[in-house]
């Protein structure tokens, strides 16, 4: 879809949260700029809000070298598409960024108990799009 958007000078948006899609869109950045279009995966409720939080935190803590984010929802469920993508992705394992590189790790590579204010919840790492995007948006 991205090549067709570049060729037709049409902006590209989607609701994905997959690292591979961000990586591909980023690799096409110069072509998109030449076509005067925006390539923006992740316009759903997953990556753009958390990426904005990452930039906000970087502005408030400019000397920070690491970022750890967590979120929780009350009473909501993943969409059918999100659940399907998560199940399909289990075979690919987890991902983290270490020393500037995205590396493969086991599913739930790290677990942590976090107090979200409304409850203490067990959390785990997931291969979310922020692993790709936050690195670029926070430099």
PLM feature spans:
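Short, hinge-like loop/turn segments at secondary-structure boundaries
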Residues: 6-7, 29-34, 57-60, 84-88
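Adenosine-phosphate binding glycine-rich loop
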Residues: 36-74
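Active-site-lining helix/loop region of Rossmann-like oxidoreductase modules
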Residues: 59-139
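Rossmann-fold NAD(P)-binding glycine/threonine-rich loop
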Residues: 2-3, 7, 15-38
């Amino acid at each position: 879809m991205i090549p067709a958007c570049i060729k037709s000078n049409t902006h590209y948006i989607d609701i994905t949260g997959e690292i591979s899609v961000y990586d591909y869109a980023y690799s096409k950045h110069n072509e998109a700029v030449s076509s005067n279009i925006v390539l923006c995966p992740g316009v759903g409720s997953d990556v753009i809000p958390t990426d904005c939080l990452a930039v906000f935190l970087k502005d408030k803590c400019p000397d920070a070298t690491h970022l750890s984010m967590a979120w929780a929802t009350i009473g909501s469920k993943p969409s059918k598409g999100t659940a399907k993508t998560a199940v399909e992705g289990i075979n690919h394992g987890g991902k983290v960024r270490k020393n500037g590189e995205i590396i493969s790790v086991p599913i739930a590579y790290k677990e942590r108990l976090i107090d979200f204010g409304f409850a203490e919840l067990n959390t785990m790492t997931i291969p979310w799009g922020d692993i790709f995007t936050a690195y670029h948006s926070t430099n």
